[in-house]
Amino acid sequence: MSNNNNRASIYGGLGSVGKIFGAPLLDVVMNQKSKTTSLNSSSSATNNNNSTVEEVNIPLFLHNGFKYIIQHGLGIEGIFRIAGTKDKVKQLQMQLDKGENIDYDASKVDPVDLADLMKIYFRELPDCLLQSDQYDHFISLLTLDRLGQIQKLRELVSSLRPENREMLKQLIWFLGRIAVNSTTNKMSEENLGLVWGPNLLWKGGKAVSTTDMMELMAGAGKIKLIVTLLIEEQEHVFNNLNATITKGEMKVSFINKIVGNKKTCQGISIIEDGESKSIWTADSAGIIKVFNADNYVTEREWDSNLGRIHTMTSVRDHAWIASSQSVSLWNKAGNLVKEFPGFHVSLTPVYSHGEYRIWAGTDQKITIFSSNTLEIVQTISIPGQFIVSITEIFGESNQVWVGATGGQIIIFDKTTGEEIRKLSTPAKRNITCLTFHKYMDKGKVWAGSEDKLIFVIDPFDDYSIVQTVSHPDLLLINTLKSISKSVWSCSRDSSIRIWDSNSFELLGSLDDYHTDAVIDAILTYNNRKMRWEFWTASFDKSVCIWSVSSELLSQPPPPLLNV
């Protein structure tokens, strides 16, 4: 990803910060900060604002390493339990101690080797991260009940040296992302506590003698319980656990990445009724996976036998799936309700005739299905065009916009299905996605293209393009989502970009966790954690979850229960 390459080159100047392994944590962090200040001063003097280096409060190789393992290592069974290749791990350690900056992606570092190196780093600290003078206090908290343990953990963590506290917070946050994927990597909170405990807490300074090791082993079971508790209860132990990525009024934080798909994710939808809500994903091999929307647990998965799935959408508690062989309807229990033969690639619910109707696009036609009668109610012929994307224009316009090949957009009356007009954009290739966004005005249509451009169009007055949005790293636009006073674009370059809907400026970019095209996304409210979350599905066979906070995003009303 180009953003990662730029970041690697910027951080490259931070290489020579002195010895890392065996050095006090504070020394490493302070040397790093000094180097950062020097680099930023040089950039300012040359007016090179693009080379500003973000200040990192933990050793940089760990900061980057956490992201690298989240990108490439979450699905490795036994990550942190299995040993790395001894010579490769030693080579990495020597490079870092010589002050070399390691680009993990360019060097194709094995995540297992990096995981092993991380444990070595903490094991070689002059004093353990949890501080040996606090050993007895940590051990004694195990005599308390669960609530008392959490309260005591908060106190003890707060009393740690600032550099230790920050390092512990980021390490435990990272280990939590590993544990979320324990069904795939077999590294539960308990297993992580077992392998990490001896590296984080020991008694009497550095564990180098036989006596030290014997004492360490004697307390290993208790230390495992402490680290397990830290991982399980991290949201109650640490403040500001999830770092904010964006700036301004809207706050976005990375929460989790969930791996385990065998093929590329093709679609993601919310399936809900008055009692429950789940997130469905579909991959290119036809596998449907269902997650609990509140705790992210994988509830079930199955082979739909649909062939290659292209996209999916939902109406309440039913999923509609477009595949190489059909459009199919599934209930929340995962049962096939009905299947309509025929290849389709785009699906959108449109409210008309007192119900939601599914508009499905394919080669030279649109098929419209009733979600009430489960029948085809209309077929619209569009000779010479392939229908790639569809969106409804909310309000009084009564329009549906359709993105096609050759940069064409076709506008239909959503009640009659009659064509209203055609628009030609500057795009030479497909209009890959469309969304209607309304904030403090009548609204505008955002149209993403295969030409790496986004066109913002007035759908009410003269149908003119009011703005063309671009970015040097932007590739094919896969989906656009309207959130608050912004529009989010997901593209083939693996980044999610957030655009201000009035100024069209880039508010932020979510870069570090997907490694391939982001194909689809949904915004949902987590009732358990009481926050809005943005779920993204990617060709890297994973989904990522981000928390979204904005004063314009209010808590939704409670669902109406069936009585």
From Swiss-Prot:
Domain (Rho-GAP) ranges: 51-238
Site feature Arginine finger, where: 81
Membrane-crossing segments per the record: none
GO molecular function terms noted in the UniProt entry: GTPase activator activity
WD repeat start-end pairs: 260-301, 303-340, 383-422, 470-509, 514-556
Alphabetized UniProt keyword annotations: Cytoplasm, GTPase activation, Repeat, WD repeat
Predominant subcellular localization, coarse grouping: cytoplasm
Signal peptide: none
Localization, UniProt: Cytoplasm
SUPFAM superfamilies: GTPase activation domain, GAP (SSF48350), WD40 repeat-like (SSF50978)
Keyword Secreted carried by entry: no
GO BP annotation list: small GTPase-mediated signal transduction
Record GO cellular component, one term: cytoplasm
Ligase listed as a keyword: no
Superkingdom to which the source organism belongs: Eukaryota
Function: Rho GTPase-activating protein involved in the signal transduction pathway.
PANTHER family membership: RHO GTPASE-ACTIVATING PROTEIN 68F (PTHR45808), RHO GTPASE-ACTIVATING PROTEIN GACX (PTHR45808:SF9)
Protein name per the record: Rho GTPase-activating protein gacX
Lineage: Eukaryota, Amoebozoa, Evosea, Eumycetozoa, Dictyostelia
